[in-house]
Amino acid sequence: MARRREIPKRQVLPDPKFGDTTLTKFVNMIMVSGKKAVAEKIVYDALDVVVDRKKGGEHAVLLREALENVGPMVEVKSRRVGGATYQVPVEVRSERKTALAMRWIVEAARKRSEKGMMLRLAGELSDALENRGSAIKKKEDTHRMAEANKAFSHFRW
């Protein structure tokens, strides 16, 4: 493994509409082929739909709540010990937790059948707020894997 200097984290600028860095990261995950204006419109419109469905609430707060519901507490990592590979349960850092939650919500939204990405994203965010949907299922599967491999938790590093 290379022993290079530690690469500094890039600073994420806050969102122009709501002043939230989490929202900026989410827009960047939705973005395809560098079309940020399109991605922003999709995310803002989807959040408007979610706020209307929930009858109130702050846009950024609802997004954070959805991400909190979808983010996993534990995940499994492969660890090789004496020729055998074990799936070792490991706690998830908060940054990785939100990154995984965003990734899972975007993936689940892209697989949905509604017409237009805005409606698909709105549907997935609504489902995430109500603890249902594909992204929540992915979280539960991850937790189930960690629970099943709890016996190997002493291999943690």
Swiss-Prot record:
Q: Which GO terms describe its cellular component?
A: small ribosomal subunit
Q: What is this protein called?
A: Small ribosomal subunit protein uS7
Q: Which GO terms describe its biological process?
A: translation
Q: Which domain of life is it from?
A: Bacteria
User: What is known about what this protein does?
Assistant: One of the primary rRNA binding proteins, it binds directly to 16S rRNA where it nucleates assembly of the head domain of the 30S subunit. Is located at the subunit interface close to the decoding center, probably blocks exit of the E-site tRNA.
Q: Name one GO molecular function term.
A: tRNA binding
Family membership, please give it. Answer: Belongs to the universal ribosomal protein uS7 family.
Q: Which InterPro entries match?
A: Ribosomal_uS7, Ribosomal_uS7_bac/org-type, Ribosomal_uS7_CS, Ribosomal_uS7_dom, Ribosomal_uS7_dom_sf
Q: Which gene encodes it?
A: rpsG
Q: Which Pfam families match?
A: Ribosomal_S7
Signal sequence region: none
HAMAP family recorded:
Ribosomal_uS7_B
Organism of provenance: Hydrogenovibrio crunogenus (strain DSM 25203 / XCL-2)
Q: How does it assemble?
A: Part of the 30S ribosomal subunit. Contacts proteins S9 and S11.
Which keywords does this chain's UniProt record carry?
A: Ribonucleoprotein, Ribosomal protein, RNA-binding, rRNA-binding, tRNA-binding
